[in-house]
Design a protein with these regions (language model features):
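Extended alpha-helical scaffolding segments used for macromolecular assembly and cargo binding
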Residues: 1-44, 49-56, 98-140, 147
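A conserved hydrophobic secondary-structure block that centers on an alpha-helix together
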Residues: 116-163, 181-190, 197-203
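Hydrophobic, small-residue-rich alpha-helical packing segments that form membrane-like cores
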Residues: 158-261
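Amphipathic helix-loop-helix modules that constitute alpha-helical solenoid scaffolds
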Residues: 42-126, 157-168, 225-229, 240-250, ...
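Short coil/turn linker motifs that delimit alpha-helical repeat modules in TPR/alpha-solenoid proteins
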Residues: 9, 25-26, 101, 119-120, ...
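Amphipathic alpha-helical segments of tetratricopeptide repeats
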Residues: 19-23, 56-66, 94, 132-136, ...
Length: 378
């Protein structure tokens, strides 16, 4: 039943069924069921529940979940150093040749890395470092391929600093993915290649890769709603930056409707914060834009400062600048700047550049408002 719910996109419900089943299962199977529950909670946007279960799963394996992004950063730097010193060479082994507890540990770190990747990027990257080292040590080709592919996605968040490494990882990932010929690995490759292009400002290339990813996942895989959610989200955001607003407005309502039908909090929040304001601005309805974003972020975790909070901030400021409320826009940014820095969101180069230009626009809008008021007073 849990698998059936996950396959229909009901991640939260599926996760709860996994937890119920774990209570009546033997130790090893119970741990695997709890891992799957943690993964589905995180992928479905039930972040607080997911982290709670994840702590239990990781604790049973002797792995501590970093309590904050800052704590995770120190561990991440160590993992990255270990990966560089070790290299990416691996000895291929079949799944049957690898101990079950070793595979479970790899999969648990994969669940954490994937589930936090586009929520709490630094904490996700820390688990990805662990995941990468474990996958390479085991040598199972599919797990190595997805580890290197996901590593390319995380590497792309460093922007121009990590461009060469990202390109190298994507090249290696493509060779592995083509060799093993597993649809999920193929879809994941185009998803990460698309996100890497998006973060590099190559939006047409990003859109093409992300559309390819959506097609592969939709036609060949089950239980991949998170993957499709992100392929669609970043594809639509690419259209936004390309200025293809008509295409964006045509496609967005149906995707939002589908997310609500399966109560996919991850998709509802991402679409609601990162994109829903734009059609409202086009229709000159800033009040509806504010309402849409508030309803979207209201459903999200209130612990920490996640990428979803960043998207909400981005949208709110865009709406206030459009409305001529530069002073309000600047106040919103300034109020959220400290939590954003604390959450290490600005360690992602694309986010830093975007937020700096937005703060400058808000400051200019404030200046314009002040000048207009001075002219009126005069």
């Amino acid at each position: 039943l849990g698998n059936a719910l996950v396959n229909t996109g009901r991640s939260g419900e599926g996760a709860r069924i996994y937890l119920q089943a774990a209570n009546n299962a033997k130790a090893e199977q119970a741990l695997e069921l709890r891992r799957k529950a943690a993964e589905q909670f995180l992928l479905g946007g039930h972040i607080d529940e997911g982290l709670k279960v994840l702590e239990t799963v990781m604790g049973s394996m002797g792995i501590k979940v970093p309590p904050t992004p800052k704590r995770a950063l120190l561990s991440l730097l160590l993992r990255r150093l270990q990966i560089r010193l070790r290299g990416l060479i691996f000895k291929s082994q079949t799944e049957a040749e690898i101990p079950a507890n070793q595979l479970l540990k790899i999969d648990a770190c994969w669940s954490a890395a994937l589930g936090l990747a586009i929520v709490d990027t630094i904490r996700g990257a820390e688990f990805q470092g662990r995941h990468m080292l474990l996958a390479l040590a085991a040598g199972e080709p599919y797990r190595v391929a997805r580890a290197i592919t996901l590593e390319a996605g995380f590497s792309s968040t460093t922007g121009s600093r990590g461009k060469k490494r990202t390109e190298m990882l994507l090249k290696m990932a493509k060779e592995l993915v083509d060799k093993i010929n597993v649809p999920h690995a193929q879809g994941l490759f185009y998803l990460m290649a698309g996100i890497a292009s998006f973060l590099a400002g190559e939006w047409l290339k990003a859109h093409e890769n992300l559309e390819q990813s959506t097609s592969i996942f939709s036609q060949n895989c089950t239980g991949v709603n998170w993957e499709i959610d992100n392929a669609q989200l970043f594809s639509l955001r690419s259209l936004l930056y390309l200025g293809e607003l008509n295409k964006l407005c045509e496609r967005l309502p149906a995707i939002v409707k589908q997310a609500h039908e399966r109560w996919d909090i991850y998709a509802i929040t991402g679409l609601g914060t990162a994109l829903s304001y734009m059609p409202c601005i086009i229709e000159d309805n800033p009040e509806q834009a504010r309402k849409n974003m508030w309803e979207a972020i209201e459903k999200w975790s209130h612990e920490g400062f996640h990428l979803q909070h960043y998207w909400a901030l981005l949208g709110q400021v865009q709406v206030e600048v459009y409305s001529g409320q530069g002073n309000t826009a600047l106040k919103i940014i300034n109020a959220q700047w400290s939590p954003m820095v604390k959450g290490l969101l600005l360690e992602v180069q694309n986010s830093l550049v975007e937020m700096l230009q937005l703060r400058a626009r808000a400051a200019l809008a404030t200046l314009k408002t002040t000048e207009n008021q001075m002219l009126k007073d005069y």
